[in-house]
């Protein structure tokens, strides 16, 4: 092993390449900040590793850094209080949903992070959003394409739960305590397209596919007064990815039509009377999201600003938590 860029052995063994190596390292050092472990643990800094998996170069260094630097499970904000990872009672939240991980079985997996306590296969937990008990069983852990059944999991572990529609991103599961883990933001979309199937006979497949992809968070699916499927995104690439997945996973060739919408905001009303007046006045500019929250669709920034000024008591919200049902009055 050769240690240090100034080691003369480098010049002996690699006389043609050593100059470029030193220049490259100097450039990287000049363009970045020195690594500080405290900043990394505080979420203020991310280390960058250079390597190649196919050449097995740098892989060992990444693994060693994970072992050395990765922090233990941290306390998490659950709304009513902070949940400590050392607590005995089980708590966890769903942070990701992935459909069709096994295309042969059309399965959907909800990825759940255990925040405290211990998961045991077959245990009964409280689903806070649905306000009912459910049984957790047949959990999985993943390594590349391999799945392994998990009988137990502890704070900091991530397990996959077979999902038949009862779990959504942001859902909190506990052994009975009323909590709600936070920190999974949902941003108001800035780009919009109407979706339709090239083959009208596949309209139901399109609807089902978009519902499942919407549950993942791959795209936002909004229900409009006209019944047309409206998709909202924060980047153009989302539309391309969704079209590709609809074709490969649901055998639906989707087409996009332009929408006269520039931005959107979730709505929060102070009382039922205000809500009804707003709905009468803005009927054709309203939609609802996957969680049933009302959404205002603005055809311009100016239109949004004027509407906000005309309705000062109504909350126009640009960011909300995943799975959050906004209180209305």
Question: Which residue ranges define each predicted feature?
Answer:
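Structural and coupling elements of P-loop NTPases
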Residues: 1-329
């Amino acid at each position: 092993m050769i240690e240090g860029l100034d080691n003369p052995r480098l010049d002996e063994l690699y006389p043609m390449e050593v100059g470029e190596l030193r220049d490259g390292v100097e450039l990287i050092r000049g363009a970045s900040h020195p690594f500080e472990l405290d900043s990394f643990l505080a979420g203020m800094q991310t280390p960058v590793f250079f390597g190649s998996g196919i050449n097995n170069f740098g892989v060992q260094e990444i693994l060693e850094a994970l072992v050395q630097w990765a922090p233990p499970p941290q306390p998490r904000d659950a709304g009513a209080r902070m949940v400590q990872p050392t607590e005995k009672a089980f708590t966890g939240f769903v942070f990701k949903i992935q459909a069709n991980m096994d295309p042969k079985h059309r399965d959907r997996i909800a990825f759940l992070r255990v925040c405290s306590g211990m998961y045991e296969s077959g245990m009964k937990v409280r689903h806070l959003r649905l306000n009912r008990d459910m049984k957790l069983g047949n959990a999985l852990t993943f390594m590349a394409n391999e799945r392994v059944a998990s009988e137990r999991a502890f704070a900091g572990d991530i397990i996959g739960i077979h999902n038949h529609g009862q779990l959504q991103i942001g859902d909190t599961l506990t052994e009975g305590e009323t909590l709600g883990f936070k920190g999974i933001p949902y941003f108001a979309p800035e780009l919009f397209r109407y979706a339709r199937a090239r083959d009208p006979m596949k309209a139901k497949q399109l609807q089902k596919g978009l519902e499942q992809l919407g549950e993942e968070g791959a795209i936002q699916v909004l229900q409009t007064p006209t019944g047309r499927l409206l998709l909202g995104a924060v980047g153009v690439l989302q539309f391309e990815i969704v079209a590709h997945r609809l074709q490969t996973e649901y055998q639906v060739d989707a087409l996009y039509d332009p929408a006269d919408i520039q931005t959107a905001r979730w709505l929060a009303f102070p009382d039922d009377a205000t809500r009804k007046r707003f709905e009468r006045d803005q009927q054709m500019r309203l939609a609802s999201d996957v969680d049933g929250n009302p959404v205002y669709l603005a055809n311009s920034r100016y239109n949004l600003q004027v509407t906000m000024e005309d309705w000062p008591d109504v909350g126009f919200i640009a960011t909300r938590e995943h799975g959050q049902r906004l209180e209305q009055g």
